[in-house]
């Protein structure tokens, strides 16, 4: 990219950067996205938004990971209207899958994004149940 094109690009994007600085974005990621080979690109984009002053709330799914854990344990669950009916035995697999997925996401975000233009960026990662929807 030439200097002139870079300056033009920066001038075109700077109003959007200014408009969204300090705002909070809620991003939902499916469990499939976490397993995808492009997950590192998603992590990079999240780190970039955070470095531009956007606050990120990340909500992740884990259906694929839950299905895998249940299959490994030899357990089956029923669905009613696309909602899993989970008994006590299956709940252990659900907790393991969700915890593992969360750990994978948090570790990817807090690694400092090696081998990328965002190397050394400080991405703050905080996990917990801080917000409840009404």
Question: What residue spans do the PLM features occupy?
Answer:
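Glycine-rich loop at the start of a catalytic domain that most often binds anionic cofactors/ligands
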Residues: 39-44, 68-77
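Active-site glycine-centered loops adjacent to acidic/histidine catalytic or metal-binding residues
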Residues: 61
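Terminal amphipathic helices with adjacent charged low-complexity linkers/tails
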Residues: 64-66
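Ligand-binding beta-strand-loop-alpha-helix segment within the catalytic cores
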Residues: 71-134
């Amino acid at each position: 990219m030439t200097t002139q094109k870079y300056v033009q690009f920066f001038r075109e994007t700077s109003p959007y950067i200014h408009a969204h600085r300090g705002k909070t974005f809620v991003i939902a990621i499916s469990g499939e996205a976490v397993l995808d080979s492009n997950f590192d690109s998603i992590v990079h984009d999240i780190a970039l938004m955070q470095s531009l002053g956007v606050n990120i709330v990340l909500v992740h799914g884990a259906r694929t990971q839950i299905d895998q854990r249940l299959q490994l344990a030899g357990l089956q669950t029923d669905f009613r209207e696309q909602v899993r009916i989970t008994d006590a035995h299956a709940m252990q697999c659900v907790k393991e899958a969700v915890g593992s997925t969360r750990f994978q996401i948090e570790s990817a975000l807090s690694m400092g994004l090696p081998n990328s233009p965002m190397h050394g960026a400080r991405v703050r990662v905080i996990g917990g149940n801080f917000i409840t929807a009404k």
